[in-house]
Amino acid sequence: MIYYRSLHNIDVATGQIGRKIIPADFNSFIEEYIRFATEENKSTKDYKVCDPNTTVVHCVESIVSQCESQGWLDLEMATLDSFANSIANKLLREEINAQESIVNLGKEIKRGSLVQALIGSNRENIQYIIAKVEHSEWYDGESLRKTFGFPSRSKNVWKSAVIPIKIDDEGTIEFGMIRVYTDNVAKYWAERFLELEEANSDESNTSRAFEAVELELKRSMKKHFRRDYYILRDSMLSTMKTRQLFNYDDVIGRIFTGYQPEEDGLTSKLQSIKQRLLKLPEKKNFDRQFNTAPEVLKKKRRLAFRIKDGIELRITGDETDFMDDITAYKDSVGKRYLQIRCIDQETFDVFSKRQ
């Protein structure tokens, strides 16, 4: 059930917000945005409230408190609207500041509108949704005034926050872990607008995610599909070695989609391995969306392979496609050899036999 909803146009260029009356036929749009934020979108990062007196948290708590005191029926909308307006104004201020910090880079904050909604089925299952959504602007052909609207087909959500709320028997309002989604690496949404504290740092997320994937691949593949294990492991490592916004589900999907195993017998097992990997964030306590911190994976870039007693092959640094440079073969009497592409002349000369 939707207890309360609001829609604001956020205009960074003019420094103004515009509150919009939501007509009945726009309810389906609001419901789709809510459904995306609460059910469909899995690429989120967990945050927690560190100060209940910050603008957004205080306003959300006040809206819920007003609904609770009014019995959740026949709500006094003017009071609720004033708190929603404060949240919209807070976003406007932070987007103006964010725009000023990137203007010299030739970039612009994505234009959009702010959707807010209070939903729930009982006092222990309440959620406040805040979402910045795509809108389009144009000039009216008759009045020549700028207006805006929403695309009927694509309903893009740029950023969102799902705030779970519980009310105990004494009327105390408690916030649960807040799920935040962003479409880029910008941190103003969570840190300066929502003013939340991340539950897991980017460093811990990066480390836990890679180690969890590495362990699952090792359990599932290393014994019988050793070459494929290293290929998939290095695909994951290669993706995480640069600082970027990392959507875990998307990355796993890209790595496995269309992958052609090197060894027989693996094809039929790939889907089940992929599904186990997709369950890891909850099992291993890392977020499905975070900014990668490549520096914590430096040791993971090092591999060692025993050749024979006294000889070891080491892979170091940022080399993640080493499998393309090393091939194995047997000679006519069954002796095993490794053939390594060498671009260093001095090393090559050491091992070159004179004709």
Where does each model-flagged region fall?
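C-terminal structured domains
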Residues: 257-355
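Long, hydrophobic alpha/beta structural blocks
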Residues: 1-302
